[in-house]
C-alpha cells in the first residue's frame, strides 16, 4: 500500500519559512528605530515600552491613531518599488498623533500579502523603519499575514497603529484658537497618501497614461511622481511648539484642506484660507485638467499642496515661519481666524491660486 500525503499549511499556500526569512531581513532596520524606553527585541509576542519614562509628565495623556496608505500601494506594486510606502504609513499615523501636540513614542505595523516574498516584505519594513526615525518613534512590533486565495501573489496592503504622549496642560486643540490667529500652511511633498483612487482612475484608467511615461510638466516619470513619499511633519511640529506658542495643528489628509482644518476650529470661529498665497504643484493641475475634475472636487479629495496646518497667534507667525525654514520646511501664512458670523462651515478656501 502506498503512503498518502496529507494536506499541509505550505500546500494551502502559506510559507512559514519565507515569513521567518522576512523577519531576519528586517531586523537590522527595526533596530535603527529603537528608543531607550524600548525593552526586548523583535520576535516577542508583544513590544515593550518602559512607561516609567513618563514620570517626568505631571499628567501624561496617551494619544493613539491607526491608519493605512490606501490604494497608493498599487502604484508601488506596479513599479516594483517597496521601500518608500513605509514612509507614507508612518506619516499617516504619526502626523495624526502630533496634531494634539503629542510626541510620537512607538508604532506597530500590519502587512498583509497574497504570498510572502521575503525581500519585498523586508523592503516595506525598511521604509517603515526609516519613517519611524524621521518621526522620532520606535517600531516595536508588527505582523505579516499571508492570505493566499484572498489576495493575488503580488498583492499587498499595509496598516499601522501608533502611540504618543502629551502633557495634559499642553494639549492642543479648538479651545486654544482665538480670533486673529494666523493660519500657517506647510508645503506637501506631493499627493501624499490620499485621493489615489481618483488619481488612478483619471490618469491610468481614463487617460491611459503609463507609469513609465515622462511627463514634461512634472519633470520626471508619472510613476516617480505618484510614489513620492508623504512628508513626515512630526518633529517639525514639535519643534514649533518649543519655539513659539501653537494653538492647533491640522493634518491635511482625506477630505482635503478645508474639511480637515474645520475639524479643529471651534463652533464660534471660522478659518479663511487664501488660495492666492501658493501655487499647487503641477500634479494637481494634471489630474484636474486630464479628468476635467472641478476645482471643488479636487479640493475635497487632494491636499492641493498643503500637508499640515499650524494655527498660531498672529504675533508668533514670524517666529513660526523662521523655525520651519530653519528645518527646511516650506511654509507661509495662508489665512486667518475670524468669528463664525454667517459662515456655515468651520473653514473655507477663497480667491484663486497663484500662477507659477
Locations of regions flagged by a protein language model:
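Glycine-/charge-enriched secondary-structure boundary and capping motifs
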Residues: 2-11, 120-138, 151-156, 210, ...
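Glycine-rich phosphate/pyrophosphate-binding loop regions near the starts of catalytic domains
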Residues: 28-189, 352
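Short helix/loop capping segments that flank catalytic or ligand/cofactor-binding pockets
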Residues: 57-58, 72-73, 193-195, 260-261, ...
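Buried hydrophobic packing segments
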Residues: 26, 48-51, 93-94, 199-202, ...
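Hydrophobic face of alpha-helices
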Residues: 23, 122-125, 196
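Short, acidic (Asp/Glu-rich) active-site segment that either coordinates a divalent metal cofactor
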Residues: 66, 157, 170-218, 222, ...
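N-terminal amphipathic/basic leader segments beginning at the initiator methionine
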Residues: 2-39
Amino acid at each position: 500500500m502506498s503512503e498518502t500525503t496529507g494536506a499541509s499549511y505550505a500546500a494551502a499556500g502559506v510559507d512559514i519559512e519565507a515569513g521567518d526569512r522576512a523577519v531576519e531581513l528586517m531586523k537590522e532596520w527595526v533596530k535603527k528605530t529603537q528608543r531607550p524606553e524600548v525593552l526586548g527585541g523583535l520576535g516577542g509576542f508583544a513590544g515593550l515600552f518602559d512607561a516609567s519614562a513618563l514620570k517626568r509628565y505631571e499628567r501624561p495623556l496617551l494619544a493613539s491613531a491607526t491608519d493605512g496608505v490606501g490604494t497608493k500601494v498599487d502604484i508601488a506594486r506596479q513599479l516594483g518599488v517597496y521601500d518608500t510606502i513605509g514612509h507614507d504609513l508612518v506619516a499617516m499615523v504619526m502626523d495624526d498623533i502630533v496634531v494634539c501636540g503629542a510626541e510620537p513614542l512607538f508604532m506597530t505595523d500590519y502587512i498583509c500579502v497574497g504570498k510572502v516574498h521575503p525581500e519585498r516584505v523586508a523592503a516595506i519594513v525598511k521604509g517603515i523603519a526609516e519613517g519611524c526615525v524621521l518621526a522620532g518613534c520606535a517600531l516595536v512590533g508588527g505582523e505579516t499575514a499571508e492570505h493566499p486565495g484572498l489576495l493575488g501573489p503580488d498583492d499587498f496592503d499595509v496598516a499601522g497603529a501608533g502611540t504618543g504622549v502629551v502633557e495634559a496642560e499642553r494639549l492642543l486643540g479648538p479651545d486654544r484658537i482665538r480670533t486673529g490667529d494666523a493660519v500657517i500652511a506647510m508645503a506637501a511633498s506631493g499627493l501624499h497618501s490620499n485621493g489615489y483612487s481618483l488619481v488612478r482612475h483619471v490618469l491610468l484608467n481614463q487617460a491611459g497614461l503609463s507609469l513609465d511615461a515622462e511627463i514634461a510638466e512634472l519633470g520626471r516619470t508619472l510613476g516617480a511622481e505618484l510614489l513620492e513619499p508623504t512628508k513626515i511633519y512630526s518633529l517639525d511640529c514639535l519643534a514649533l511648539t518649543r519655539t513659539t506658542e501653537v494653538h492647533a495643528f491640522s493634518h491635511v489628509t482625506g477630505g482635503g484642506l478645508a474639511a480637515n482644518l474645520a475639524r479643529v476650529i471651534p463652533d464660534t470661529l471660522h478659518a479663511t484660507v487664501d488660495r492666492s498665497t501658493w501655487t499647487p504643484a503641477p500634479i494637481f493641475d494634471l489630474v484636474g485638467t486630464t479628468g476635467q475634475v472641478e476645482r471643488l472636487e479636487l479640493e475635497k479629495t487632494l491636499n492641493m499642496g498643503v500637508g499640515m496646518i499650524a494655527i498660531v497667534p498672529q504675533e508668533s507667525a514670524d517666529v513660526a515661519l523662521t523655525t520651519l525654514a530653519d528645518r527646511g520646511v516650506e511654509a507661509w501664512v495662508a489665512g486667518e481666524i475670524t468669528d463664525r458670523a454667517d459662515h456655515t462651515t468651520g473653514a473655507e478656501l477663497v480667491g484663486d491660486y497663484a500662477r507659477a
